[in-house]
């Protein structure tokens, strides 16, 4: 039986976070009434000329620097010629032979797949290019009595099309890359990453070939995948479709396909065009884009600390593991919250802060379906909770209750933890005399567990600890309870 290798390359369209469009002053705001944000340039009215948006160029430069790419000192805009109702000019302004960003790479972390028996691993994906272009408008096929409505609000919206080499070998790798890229463009502040609004969407080029064969198989391109789940499902379906087709004696046709999320399958959209079909030529209305070293240096000086650099700093500065550092820098907001938390709680509590952020805080965020920047418990409020754990005022169990209380009541005061501790009498019992008296009562009431422990059953000790904690309503210092029990049991 033939063993097949999957070959995947991704083309990602990231909408750049400029206020105005790439070649006009019209707004890029999402959700406006149809055709209310389309100026004469976007409508391709006679006599208008495009003017390049400097902010879009600077965002492209920022991306190129972040991935270690070459920022072209001179790049050229080209006309990509095709007819479609939502493309008023009859061509799209893009870049072809000389893109603004050339090369670069992104390192991805592919998670373990226990069902397939695969461990987690890292991989570097090389990028071919990233180029600037304008978006087209939108065709609306519903509510028009069999006709099509055209909304040109998106026409001219600035995009950075980011193209990888065909180096990914599974849907899992493609999703890991897409997530890494998604996180990076948001970290850099060049794209809001809103997939529901179309700000970040992927086209997947998928082919299969026998293992060991160097020549690529015929590829199909799956267009406009706007969620990570759709990306994974579409690739997996397409791989199965192509393998079954070849093994049944058929041939894969080079074509563009769409993914149907309801049926969880891809379907043919049109035959795939090659570059020559678009008749690219330099746009005579736009001068070549010249980017000097001083411009690049200025943009570099304004860039935030990159995730990889911050990860290494977290490991060295706070003593967290490489895995923890990766989670803590998964988004810029998460990293900023962690640093604010440690600044308030103290560097000595950095590991405790990391554990809480990845554990209880993330759990509550997932429960409520919100991101860290919408967390109702501020870094200062959580820091006080951690300080009270560290100084022995409360146990970790009580701390969790206090955290949930602050979360649910959306308390505004930084000293919420101390207020709740006093109001509910939650201070940990650390008085040795008081604890000894309680433990004596527990031992007297649980003679059977005492006998079992002395007979060598360790589980009996845990049962006694549990009874002691129950007797103190969770307020006892667990470490002291353990020590006193061991002392009394000999």
Swiss-Prot record:
It is an enzyme of class 6 (ligase). The keyword Hydrolase does not apply. It catalyses: L-glutamyl-tRNA(Gln) + L-glutamine + ATP + H2O = L-glutaminyl-tRNA(Gln) + L-glutamate + ADP + phosphate + H(+); L-aspartyl-tRNA(Asn) + L-glutamine + ATP + H2O = L-asparaginyl-tRNA(Asn) + L-glutamate + ADP + phosphate + 2 H(+). One of its GO terms (biological process) is glutaminyl-tRNAGln biosynthesis via transamidation. The keyword ATP-binding applies. HAMAP family: GatB (MF_00121). Belongs to the GatB/GatE family. GatB subfamily. This is Aspartyl/glutamyl-tRNA(Asn/Gln) amidotransferase subunit B. It comes from Burkholderia mallei (strain ATCC 23344).
């Amino acid at each position: 039986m033939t063993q097949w290798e999957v070959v995947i390359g991704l083309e990602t369209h990231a909408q750049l976070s400029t206020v105005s469009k790439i070649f006009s002053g019209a707004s890029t705001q999402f959700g406006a009434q149809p055709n209310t944000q389309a100026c004469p340039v976007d409508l391709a009215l006679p006599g208008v000329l495009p003017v390049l948006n400097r902010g879009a160029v600077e965002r492209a430069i920022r991306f190129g620097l972040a991935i270690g790419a070459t920022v072209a000192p001179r790049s050229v805009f080209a006309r990509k010629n095709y007819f479609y109702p939502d493309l008023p000019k009859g061509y799209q302004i893009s870049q072809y032979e000389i893109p603004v960003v050339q090369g670069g790479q992104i390192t991805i972390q592919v998670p373990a797949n226990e069902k397939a028996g695969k461990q987690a691993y890292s991989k570097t994906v090389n990028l071919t290019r990233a180029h600037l272009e304008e978006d087209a408008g939108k065709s609306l096929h519903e509510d028009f009595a069999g006709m099509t409505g055209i909304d040109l609000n998106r026409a001219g919206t600035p995009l950075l099309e980011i193209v990888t080499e065909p180096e990914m070998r599974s849907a899992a790798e493609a999703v890991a890359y897409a997530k890494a890229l998604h996180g990076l463009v948001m970290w850099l502040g060049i794209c809001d990453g809103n997939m529901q609004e179309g700000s970040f969407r992927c086209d997947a080029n998928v082919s299969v070939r026998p293992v060991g064969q160097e020549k690529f198989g015929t590829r199909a391109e799956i267009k406009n995948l706007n969620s990570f789940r759709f990306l994974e499902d579409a690739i997996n379906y397409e791989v199965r479709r192509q393998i079954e087709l070849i093994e049944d004696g058929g041939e894969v046709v080079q074509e563009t396909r769409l993914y149907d999320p309801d049926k969880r399958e891809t379907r043919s959209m049109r035959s795939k065009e090659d570059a020559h079909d678009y008749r690219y030529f330099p746009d005579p209305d736009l001068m070549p884009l010249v980017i000097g070293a001083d411009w690049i240096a200025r943009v570099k000086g304004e860039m935030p600390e990159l995730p990889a650099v911050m990860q290494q700093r977290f490991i060295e500065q706070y003593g967290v593991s490489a895995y923890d550092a990766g989670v803590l820098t998964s988004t810029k907001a998460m990293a900023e919250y962690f640093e604010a938390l440690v600044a308030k709680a103290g560097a000595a509590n950095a590991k405790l802060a990391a554990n809480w952020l990845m554990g209880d805080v993330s759990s509550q965020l997932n429960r409520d379906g919100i991101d860290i920047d919408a967390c109702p418990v501020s870094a200062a409020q959580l820091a006080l909770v951690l300080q009270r754990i560290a100084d022995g005022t409360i146990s970790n169990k009580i701390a969790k209750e206090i955290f949930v209380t602050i979360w649910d009541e959306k308390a505004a005061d930084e000293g919420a933890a101390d207020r709740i501790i006093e109001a509910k009498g939650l201070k940990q019992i650390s008085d040795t005399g008081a604890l000894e008296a309680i433990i004596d009562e527990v031992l007297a009431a649980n003679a059977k567990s005492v006998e079992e422990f002395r007979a060598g059953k360790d589980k009996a000790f845990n049962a006694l600890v549990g009874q002691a904690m129950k007797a103190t309503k969770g307020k006892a210092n667990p470490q002291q309870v353990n020590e006193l029990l061991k002392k009394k049991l000999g």
